[in-house]
């Protein structure tokens, strides 16, 4: 997953050659405006047309975590915008799945993706097993977010945890990551194993991306 950027075609060429699978993504607009809608749509259509013939691309992902559509949970015009992007993408490519807003507050989507940076494996596993029915609704599932925007229902799509982990090392103040920082590579491997094992045990989870 080349996160929130459009890759140089040389990168995609070598992914074709080496057999690496890629999610094709897009940089976010800063906020929702008429101008952002026009420019985003134009640029995204160019991206799809330009990269359509790269077999390495397995899904189109134009938006992430409601960036650029920050009120999508309840605001109809932002929901309609994501629907328009979904169907425009489908009009150019009927084969690949489209994940319009990766992570949460989905409207129309071929895959339901969730982001969760929980650092304790047992907590992560229990969240997605004990509260499955609540998660796949418009109820909040984690960090104040819901899997679906208001007015939308889960329709049996595959479910992927497309962001998790993000473990930071305690090496300096500029280290980036989530949760408590680890001090050694052994600590990193232990936590990575703990949360990854938990994700793999979730019975309805079809895939994951660290």
Report the location of each language-model feature.
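Substrate-binding/catalytic cleft of secreted carbohydrate-active enzymes
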Residues: 1-210
């Amino acid at each position: 997953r080349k996160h929130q950027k459009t890759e140089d075609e040389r990168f995609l060429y070598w992914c074709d050659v080496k057999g690496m699978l890629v999610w094709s993504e897009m940089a976010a607009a800063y906020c929702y405006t008429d101008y952002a809608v026009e420019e985003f749509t134009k640029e995204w259509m160019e991206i799809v047309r330009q990269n359509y013939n790269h077999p390495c691309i397995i899904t189109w992902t134009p938006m992430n975590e409601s960036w650029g559509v920050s009120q999508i949970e309840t605001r109809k015009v932002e929901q309609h915008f994501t629907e328009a992007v979904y169907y425009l993408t489908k009009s150019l490519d009927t084969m690949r799945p489209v994940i319009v807003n990766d992570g949460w507050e989905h409207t129309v989507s071929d895959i339901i993706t969730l982001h969760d940076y929980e650092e304790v494996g047992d907590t992560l596993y229990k969240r997605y097993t004990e509260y499955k029915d609540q998660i796949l609704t418009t109820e909040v599932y984690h960090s104040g977010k819901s899997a679906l925007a208001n007015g939308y229902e889960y329709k049996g799509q595959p479910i992927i945890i497309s962001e998790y982990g993000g473990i930071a090392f305690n090496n300096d103040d500029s280290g980036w990551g989530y949760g408590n920082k680890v001090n050694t590579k052994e600590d990193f491997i232990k936590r990575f194993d703990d949360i990854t094992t938990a994700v793999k045990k979730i019975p309805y989870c079809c895939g994951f991306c660290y």
